[in-house]
UniProtKB/Swiss-Prot annotation:
Signal peptide: none annotated. The keyword ATP-binding does not apply. It comes from Caenorhabditis elegans. InterPro entries: Calycin, Fatty_acid-bd, Lbp1-4. Keywords: Lipid-binding, Transport. It comes from the Eukaryota. The lineage of its organism: Eukaryota, Metazoa, Ecdysozoa, Nematoda, Chromadorea. Belongs to the calycin superfamily. Fatty-acid binding protein (FABP) family. Transmembrane segments: none annotated. This is Fatty acid-binding protein homolog 4. The gene is lbp-4. GO terms for molecular function: lipid binding.
């Protein structure tokens, strides 16, 4: 099992659907939601130099994350965009790349999974769900890796 080449590249956030509603359902207050929505987001997905390992970067105007040399199906710990330490697992199944996070400071209530696909416009589409609210975010490819 490996991540297909079509996922590798640099992507910039283009548009979102139900993002404010999604954040609200997670208890994020109005002011913080506005700050999050204003922050640009670039995602970079690439192969690592080591065979079978990958990298993902999230670049924002506030904070960056850089997950290096992860393997599909293997847990690792790293800081999330919220500044907390997370247990993270990436997986790939049925043409969907998933990114599962558990905040180590609240493992019982903090599980989140992000699902990534490549649409027919060659955009990275991220899907998240909470309390029945489905959020999608589209990222335009700005360069091939």
């Amino acid at each position: 099992m490996s991540v297909p080449d079509k996922f590798f590249g640099r992507y910039q956030l283009d548009k979102s659907e139900n993002f404010d509603e999604f954040l609200s359902s997670k208890g994020v207050n109005w002011f913080v939601r506005q700050m999050i929505k204003l922050a640009g987001l670039t995602k970079i997905i690439s192969q690592n130099q080591e065979a079978g390992k990958y990298n993902m970067e999230n670049l924002t105007s506030k904070k960056n994350t850089n997950y290096q040399a992860w393997e599909l199906g293997k847990k690792f710990e790293a800081p999330g965009l919220d500044g907390n330490q997370h247990e993270i697992t990436f997986d790939f199944k049925d043409e969907i790349l998933s990114e599962h996070h558990i905040r180590l400071n609240e493992p019982e209530t903090s599980a989140e999974t992000y699902f990534y696909t490549i649409d027919d416009q060659n955009q990275l589409v991220m899907r998240m769900e909470n309390n029945g609210i489905v959020c999608r975010r589209w990222f335009k490819r700005v360069e091939q890796k």
